[in-house]
Amino acid sequence: MNKPTPLVDQFQRRITYLRLSVTDRCDLRCTYCMPERMTFLPRREVLSLEELHQMALGFIDRGITKLRLTGGEPLVRRDMLELVHALGRKLGDGLEELTMTTNGTRLADFADDLYAAGMRRINVSLDTLDRGMFETLSRRDSLPQVLEGLAAAKAAGLKVKINTVALKGINEDQLSGLIAWAHGEGFDLTLIEVMPLGEVEGDRIDHYLPLIAVQDTLERDWTLVPSDHRSGGPARYFDVAETGGRLGLITPLTNNFCAGCNRIRVTATGQLYACLGGEERVDLRAALRSDEPERRLSEALDTAMRIKPERHHFAIDERGQSPALARHMSMTGG
Ligand code: SAM
Ligand code: SF4
């Protein structure tokens, strides 16, 4: 049999990083991510454990070396650990890194198992250390569980990066304190701009906070030294001289990072989105549920390489309006 060809798109970008959403469900309801009464998908529409596994193997065959499991909240999926263990067996055999983005509420139960399966680094999303604000933002009073989960992750030996969405008039005056706390714990921290994805209640644009402005404010408290660290993602990094820790800034709306894009995303229903900010997609579930799953999957990946757009189309116009893309971040996993 011929060796499978690597995934290279029409702009000669080599795709090596897959973000795979394993569920659209979540135990939190972050206001910028989903409405309180979110309608979740019927289970039959979501890929089964076997389908997720088979699909991931197909990607690894085609040169995906980094796989991030996300959601929704990946740790609310019941058979999640089985999947992590199965994929962990590919580490060193095509796969170089298996990682996860989680809200941390269930980490206390899972941290040791994740490490045992071969995971070494995880991203944990946390926007505030104030319990009341956490509850307002996520509509659940779960900060204590998240902090417990973080302690468990650290004790298990997992390297943690905190992801914080910067929100104007909400947590903007806590960002400096979050840096001090995270670096004190030995965690890196990355700030993210809120993105126009999916309809949510209230006006997300009211809370859009350009990180360029945040950087200026942070520089009053911290010495930010530009770093040439790269994570294979869109973040720019700084070393914080006072803490010795690392700060990342992800600015999808103010900065164009598409030229170096190495990633694709697949939703829990097996829709491959070639770009987080675009509508171009390929239905991998149809391929997986066909008579010839292996061949159809590989063809679908070739199609994805043909349609991956050169750049994203996010925009917030001069009136502060954004033509929100119809899908939620909990579908494509951020
Ligand atoms: N539930 C997990 C979590 O929260 O880490 C994984 C999925 S969540 C959709 C992934 C990341 O997307 C989180 O860091 C979250 O803060 C971020 N996110 C969700 N909606 C967003 C939006 N509209 N703009 C920017 N980031 C968003
Ligand atoms: Fe859930 Fe993550 Fe969305 Fe918050 S950001 S509602 S934790 S999926």
Regions found by a protein language model. Give the residues of each.
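Auxiliary Fe-S-binding modules of radical SAM enzymes
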Residues: 2-17, 180-184, 194-334
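Short, small-residue-rich loop/turn micro-motifs
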Residues: 24-26, 34-37, 126-128, 193, ...
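A short acidic, helix-capping loop that chelates divalent metal ions and anchors anionic groups
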Residues: 38-42, 130-137, 198-202, 283-284
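Radical SAM/AdoMet-radical enzyme domain recognition
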Residues: 46-69, 77-192
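Conserved G/P- and acidic residue-centered "switch" motifs that form tight phosphate/ATP-binding loops
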Residues: 73
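Canonical Radical SAM [4Fe-4S] cluster-binding loop centered on the CxxxCxxC motif
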Residues: 10-50
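Residues that scaffold the ATP/ADP-binding catalytic core of kinase and kinase-like folds
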Residues: 29, 33, 77, 132, ...
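Glycine-centered loop/turn positions within well-structured domains
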Residues: 28, 131-132, 256, 282
